[in-house]
């Protein structure tokens, strides 16, 4: 049975190529992260550490490490924050830090408001404007 599994994977080089491409993409975007998230993803992407190894180092459960890595992977490969980065000249500095907090770090409205010293209303208003901008730029680059 094990031989069949190995043979099946050997016949799917496109899956290996897709995984390699995804890891290269993540590697190229590690600089967008900061703090613990950057360390976590560096251990995973650059060092090839397993969830179990990272969990032992951090003193947390393997599940929480896996969950955070999957969240960060999704956010790093999602186009919303990158669209903001590519068009940062059209967004204010405040909008850029709020976009980073929301789309990349995954902070809640309340957490962003506390971190940035503004009201939740102000954060909600800025995020609505950022999302509108993202929709507009998406429709320009990908017209239906």
What are these regions (language model features)?
Residues 1-52:
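DNA-contacting interfaces and partner/effector-binding or oligomerization modules
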Residues 34-47, 91-107:
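Short amphipathic alpha helix immediately N-terminal
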Residues 45, 69, 76, 102, ...:
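DNA major-groove recognition helix of helix-turn-helix
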Residues 53-58, 111-118:
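Short alpha-helical "recognition helix" segments of helix-turn-helix
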Residues 74-87, 131-144:
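Short, Lys/Arg-enriched C-terminal cap helix and immediately downstream tail that follows
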């Amino acid at each position: 049975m094990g031989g069949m599994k190995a043979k099946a994977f050997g016949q799917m080089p496109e899956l290996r190529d897709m995984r390699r491409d995804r890891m290269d993409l993540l590697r190229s975007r590690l600089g967008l992260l900061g703090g613990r998230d950057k360390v976590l993803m560096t251990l995973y992407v650059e060092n090839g550490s397993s969830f179990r190894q990272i969990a032992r180092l951090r003193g947390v459960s393997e599940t929480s490490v896996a969950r955070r890595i999957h969240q960060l992977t999704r956010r790093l490969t999602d186009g919303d924050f990158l669209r903001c980065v590519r068009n940062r000249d059209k967004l204010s500095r405040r909008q850029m830090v709020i976009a980073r907090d929301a789309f990349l770090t995954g902070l809640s409205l309340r957490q962003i408001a506390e971190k940035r010293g503004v009201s939740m209303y102000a954060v909600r208003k800025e995020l609505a404007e950022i999302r509108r901008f993202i929709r507009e730029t998406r429709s320009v680059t990908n017209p239906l």
